[in-house]
Curated annotation (Swiss-Prot):
Multifunctional triterpene synthase producing taraxerol, beta-amyrin and lupeol in the ratio 70:17:13. This is Taraxerol synthase. Its EC number is 5.4.99.35. It comes from Rhizophora stylosa. It catalyses: (S)-2,3-epoxysqualene = taraxerol; (S)-2,3-epoxysqualene = beta-amyrin; (S)-2,3-epoxysqualene = lupeol. Pfam families: SQHop_cyclase_C, SQHop_cyclase_N. Keywords: Isomerase, Repeat. SUPFAM superfamilies: Terpenoid cyclases/Protein prenyltransferases (SSF48239).
Length: 771
């Protein structure tokens, strides 16, 4: 039988692994064939069966396996009795304190030895297939993902197959060509026959693919992977010429102008396109050619296939100018660049330059790369360049950084959310005002943040490689990851500012002010002319370049953009920093905050909310915006944007006192409630805190009492909160599952409620008695 174990901070014994902080923050799963007691194995199997039975009711998993492991290792038992609020009963201070303490103790018990909180950060169903395809075409699938891994991959695929036989872009999505074709190919590569798979999974999937025209209708991102596999032809893909790397960096089409994630995907993919790399045409590949196309492979008009896309995958239509651009490259540029003499001079030089960038990014990120999509393409490119080379071996050693195991099987995450979740968890615990009770937990969390702050800028001449400085800032996952993010920096900075005001006997050695100054410098560097904040690098390319967005299912991916929630986090952090260290760049910070507030006001929707890009959606954006505006001194009385936002939140409150928003808001940009007007506890927490920041407790606390009651009564017996719909978002169309959110935000909201609502009520009551 065996069990899976989550390991923390390991890697020092692998000669192909490097780290700047001794692997602090690294989380990897290992299968122990002889591990686990019979009771433990039964518990895991019960969790798997419960998930599968209820998978169409709640699509994201509860991420139970590592939590069961940690709670068992720490011998955790919830000792604080549960108290619920009955109908007609007022919430008192003791009841909410009881719920807060129960949740805080549960959160403390799930903290890792490194000080962060492990968690699943996934949902895009398409993350997994490129890894299976990539490892298959280079011949390393069975060594990297042996039998137990493959068993969990298949479990994951079966768990997330829709009732119609397809898979969507993410867990809650309807069937798409992209998701269905990718998962069908995975099942076949992993040994399932054309009629195999659980509940006839393969045949049901293939029927959906063929009924929608076959895989020539897969979106662009799928065409390239199927071309590498040999199930598609490269001439059916729109051009990705590596020669763009040879253009002057100021040229609009140069990758230097791109959003960093787009640039780093384009980088290795342009190399593979330039090489027209195709894996071995195995008997399986030949079978897939027959199974997935509606006509014989050699009769397909590949040039026409370049512009085909199933309507289910089409979130935004390509403008005619983009198709003209691709057609010109395909018809005129590529025939010249792939023939003598230009192929020997220009193309080969372009490919060499491209791989220089690939190797730089690999080394700068310790071969983790910015995300799973980028990682696997870089790994395949390194193998194509040199199958026995050290870069490829180092890539193999970092694959486990992306593997996550839960009760629904094995997935590939986008990237770990260690620092982001830690910064939010720490602030939630600090808000509880249980400093002595939670002291050891807070100290470990602070140690993790200190160990995760970037020690240096990217290596070498990073500006020549189109990277931004990042010394003193924080990344989304770990220090080794190396891709610095502003919102992670802002939230981590606020934690460090809180700790700077706490007794050293509780939090230990404090971060030097100079290291906080470095974080502030990074934040100040990313403000755009409109006052908004980008997240990774300054906005370089013009927004008009989005007309060339090659992905049919994502928006705003070509260049960097400003984000409401990132801007709000920056305001909060710098307001707090300015109070603690008023002498550092004070005038610049004041000007920064003024411009950022103006950006928030300008980006408010006419009906009151703000659009969030990284969370669903209007609830997420509105929570952050109200928090940022309040931090900058804006109130319900002096800022017209706040009453509009409050009106929106009050109008969308559900009957049970909560709030619930569908991921569909992201694509339509119109507020869309969850089906059945049901509530979501994480979104309820966002709305509750947003209203608290607006001063709602002073006007009418009734809506706040209703939502707090829902949170308290929804808490589970051990202090956890139940998993519900996904609450993260990726580029407008893809729901993201941040499993840690269900523990962080309800706790934070109840702590804010106790302090700012019940505390206010208590003061008012005391004043009335005294009068």
């Amino acid at each position: 039988m065996g069990v899976w174990r989550l390991k923390i901070g390991e890697g020092a014994n692998n000669p192909y692994l490097t780290s700047t902080n001794n692997f602090v923050g690294r989380q990897t799963w290992v299968f122990e064939p002889d591990g686990g007691t019979p009771e433990e194995r039964d518990q895991v199997e019960e969790a798997r069966q419960n998930y599968f039975k209820n998978r169409f009711r709640v699509r994201p998993c509860s991420d139970l396996l590592w939590q069961m492991q940690f709670l068992r290792e720490k011998n955790f038992r919830q000792k604080i009795p549960q108290v619920k609020v009955r109908d007609g009963e007022e919430i008192n201070y003791e009841t909410v304190t009881n719920a807060i303490r129960r949740s805080a103790h549960y959160l403390s018990a799930t903290q890792s030895s490194d000080g962060f909180w492990p968690a699943d950060a996934s949902a895009p169903v398409f993350y997994l297939a490129p890894w299976v395809i990539g490892l298959y075409v280079i011949g390393h699938l069975n060594t990297v993902f042996p039998a137990e891994h493959q068993k969990e991959i298949l479990r994951y695929i079966y768990c997330h197959q829709n009732e119609d036989g397809g898979w969507g872009l993410h867990y809650e999505d309807g069937g798409t060509m992209f998701g269905t074709a990718f998962n069908y190919v995975c099942m076949r590569i992993l040994g399932e026959g054309p009629g195999g798979g659980r509940d006839n999974a393969c045949e049901r999937a293939r029927k959906g693919i063929l009924d929608h025209g076959g895989v020539t209708y897969i979106p662009s991102g799928g065409k390239t992977w199927l071309a590498m596999l040999g199930v598609f032809d490269w001439s059916g893909c729109n051009p990705m010429p590596p020669e763009f790397w040879m253009l002057p960096p100021f040229f609009p089409m140069h990758p230097a102008q791109m959003w960093c994630y787009c640039r780093i995907v384009y980088m290795p993919m342009s190399y593979l396109y330039g090489r027209r790399f195709v894996g071995p045409i195995t008997p399986l590949v030949q079978q897939l050619r027959e199974e997935l196309h509606t006509q014989p492979f050699h009769e397909i008009e590949w040039s026409k296939a370049r512009h085909l896309c199933a309507k289910e995958d089409l979130f935004h239509r390509r403008p005619w100018i983009q198709e003209l651009f691709w057609d010109c490259l395909h018809t005129f540029a590529e025939p010249l660049l792939t023939r003598w003499p230009l192929n020997n001079f220009i193309r080969e030089k372009a490919l060499k330059i491209t791989m220089e960038h690939v190797h730089y990014d690999d080394k700068a990120s310790h071969y983790i790369n910015p995300g799973s999509v980028e990682k696997v393409i870089c790994m395949v490119a390194c193998w194509v360049e040199d199958p026995s080379g050290e870069p490829f071996q180092r890539h193999l050693a970092r694959i486990s950084d992306y593997v996550w195991i839960a009760e629904d099987g094995m997935r590939i995450t986008g990237i770990g959310s260690q620092t982001w979740d830690a910064a939010l968890s720490i602030q939630a615990l600090i808000a509880c005002n249980l400093i002595e009770e939670m002291g050891p937990t807070l100290k470990k969390g602070y140690d993790f943040l200190k160990n995760s702050q970037a020690k240096d800028n990217p290596p070498g001449d990073f500006k020549r490689m189109y990277r931004h400085f990042g010394k003193g800032a924080w990344a989304f996952s770990s220090q080794d990851y190396g891709v610095i993010a502003l919102d992670c920096t802002a939230e981590s900075l606020m934690c460090c500012l809180h700790f700077s005001m706490m007794p050293p006997e509780i939090v230990g050695e404090k971060l030097e002010p100079e290291k906080l100054y470095l974080a502030v410098d990074f934040i100040l560097s990313l403000q755009s002319k409109n006052g908004g904040l980008t997240c990774w690098e300054p906005a370089r390319g013009g927004k008009w370049l989005e007309v060339l967005n090659p992905l049919e299912f994502f928006e705003n991916i070509v260049v960097e953009h400003e984000y409401v929630e990132v801007t709000a986090s920056a305001i909060n952090a710098l307001v707090m920093f300015k109070k603690r260290y008023p002498g550092y760049r004070e005038k610049e910070i004041e000007h920064f905050i003024s411009k950022a507030v103006h950006y928030l006001i300008q980006t408010q929707f006419p009906n009151g909310p703000w659009y969030g890009v990284w969370g669903i959606c209007f609830m997420y954006g509105t929570y952050f915006a109200l928090k940022g505006l309040a931090a900058a001194g804006n109130t319900y009385a002096n800022c017209p944007a706040i009453p509009k936002a409050v009106d929106f939140l009050l109008k969308t409150q559900c009957q049970d006192g909560g709030w619930g928003e569908s991921y569909l808001s992201g694509t339509t940009k119109v507020y869309t409630p969850l089906e059945g007007n049901r509530s979501n506890l994480v979104q309820t927490a966002w709305a509750l805190m947003g209203l608290i920041h607006s001063g709602q407790a002073e006007r009418d606390p009734t809506p706040l009492h209703r939502s707090a009651k829902l949170l308290i009564n929804s808490q589970t017996s051990d202090g956890d909160f139940p998993q519900q719909d996904s609450t993260g978002l990726l580029k407008g169309s893809c729901a993201m599952h941040y499993a840690a959110y269900r523990n962080i935000f309800p706790l934070w909201a109840l702590a804010a409620y106790r302090t700012h609502v019940l505390g206010l009520t208590s003061k008012a009551h005391s004043s009335a008695v005294m009068e």
